[in-house]
Amino acid sequence: MAEKPAQEQEQKRAMEPAVLDDIIRRLVEFRNTRPGSGKQVHLSEGEIRQLCAVSKEIFLQQPNLLELEAPIKICGDIHGQYSDLLRLFEYGGFPPEANYLFLGDYVDRGKQSLETICLLLAYKIKYPENFFLLRGNHESASINRIYGFYDECKRRFNVRLWKIFTDCFNCLPVAALIDDRILCMHGGISPELKSLDQIRNIARPMDIPESGLVCDLLWSDPSGDVGWGMNDRGVSYTFGADKVAEFLEKHDMDLICRAHQVVEDGYEFFAERQLVTVFSAPNYCGEFDNAGAMMSIDESLMCSFQILKPSEKKSPFL
């Protein structure tokens, strides 16, 4: 078998701690800049490639269904709203002050997808057993080719770098189980999901299929209707409160925690508090008045919420 190129071999090795710490320092220092200044964090293409290569190996070493323990903080969609990601860490504590699980959709729509994903990958490498990232439906080439990440990579670097991110995203895990009681994913449950071993056995790297279990985990939505229904997104299904209750009872769990939908208060319960949606990008896309939220789960599995309020609408003349 042909040897892998030396450059790729080199990148897969653990990053020098000093290099990693310097990347994190530059990314976090951004919080001292004036909001709306348009300033970007400068990372080299080589540094970003190494973040992708090293984190990808960690994702593949860890299971596709992460088994985690409380206490832990859970964050929903970020969508390139980098200043808001830093605000979440200011509220919850910068790693390793707290354990974190992010539910996907790091890129697209916002202005700083690159800073957002680079800081998250850097923390994953620095704290692999305390910091966890799931895959969202936007961590997919067919989606982020359209909704902004491809254009940001091309404008700031090149298309090659976007392809390297695609390879990394194809290795992200798709679900997490907290203390055997709380199941977390980006989208929701699937009519095909009969056993958690189905998630454990999904081979990676993989692209997100157009239908089936993985597609549903990343795309499905709760609905006021009963049973399984057609999803307005044109992908996957909707599921009623009856399906949530049925799933939790069958698997002896208490709660499903997911993201994927903008909710006004940053979090919203469904199915008599058996499912919660967490969305962490306030003033989403500058078009919504929503708050963002982070869910904290303590050792006794009590859930509480920290809220990022939407900013006041500023008059353009002030």
Swiss-Prot record:
<keyword id="KW-0464">Manganese</keyword>
<dbReference type="GO" id="GO:0004722">
    <property type="term" value="F:protein serine/threonine phosphatase activity"/>
</dbReference>
<dbReference type="InterPro" id="IPR004843">
    <property type="entry name" value="Calcineurin-like_PHP_ApaH"/>
</dbReference>
<dbReference type="InterPro" id="IPR031675">
    <property type="entry name" value="STPPase_N"/>
</dbReference>
<keyword id="KW-0963">Cytoplasm</keyword>
<feature type="binding site">
    <location>
        <position position="137"/>
    </location>
    <ligand>
        <name>Mn(2+) 2</name>
    </ligand>
</feature>
<comment type="similarity">
    <text>Belongs to the PPP phosphatase family. PP-1 subfamily.</text>
</comment>
<feature type="active site" description="Proton donor">
    <location>
        <position position="138"/>
    </location>
</feature>
<dbReference type="InterPro" id="IPR050341">
    <property type="entry name" value="PP1_catalytic_subunit"/>
</dbReference>
<dbReference type="Pfam" id="PF00149">
    <property type="entry name" value="Metallophos"/>
</dbReference>
<protein>
    <recommendedName>
        <fullName>Serine/threonine-protein phosphatase PP1 isozyme 1</fullName>
        <ecNumber>3.1.3.16</ecNumber>
    </recommendedName>
</protein>
<keyword id="KW-0539">Nucleus</keyword>
<dbReference type="InterPro" id="IPR029052">
    <property type="entry name" value="Metallo-depent_PP-like"/>
</dbReference>
<dbReference type="Pfam" id="PF16891">
    <property type="entry name" value="STPPase_N"/>
</dbReference>
<feature type="binding site">
    <location>
        <position position="186"/>
    </location>
    <ligand>
        <name>Mn(2+) 2</name>
    </ligand>
</feature>
<feature type="binding site">
    <location>
        <position position="105"/>
    </location>
    <ligand>
        <name>Mn(2+) 2</name>
    </ligand>
</feature>
<feature type="binding site">
    <location>
        <position position="77"/>
    </location>
    <ligand>
        <name>Mn(2+) 1</name>
    </ligand>
</feature>
<dbReference type="GO" id="GO:0000164">
    <property type="term" value="C:protein phosphatase type 1 complex"/>
</dbReference>
<dbReference type="InterPro" id="IPR006186">
    <property type="entry name" value="Ser/Thr-sp_prot-phosphatase"/>
</dbReference>
<feature type="binding site">
    <location>
        <position position="260"/>
    </location>
    <ligand>
        <name>Mn(2+) 2</name>
    </ligand>
</feature>
<dbReference type="GO" id="GO:0005634">
    <property type="term" value="C:nucleus"/>
</dbReference>
<dbReference type="GO" id="GO:0046872">
    <property type="term" value="F:metal ion binding"/>
</dbReference>
<keyword id="KW-0378">Hydrolase</keyword>
<comment type="function">
    <text>Serine/threonine-protein phosphatase that possesses phosphatase activity toward para-nitrophenyl phosphate (pNPP) in vitro. Acts as a negative regulator of abscisic acid (ABA) signaling. In vitro, can dephosphorylate and inhibit the kinase activity of SRK2E/SNRK2.6, an activator of ABA signaling.</text>
</comment>
<feature type="binding site">
    <location>
        <position position="79"/>
    </location>
    <ligand>
        <name>Mn(2+) 1</name>
    </ligand>
</feature>
<feature type="binding site">
    <location>
        <position position="105"/>
    </location>
    <ligand>
        <name>Mn(2+) 1</name>
    </ligand>
</feature>
<keyword id="KW-0904">Protein phosphatase</keyword>
<keyword id="KW-0479">Metal-binding</keyword>
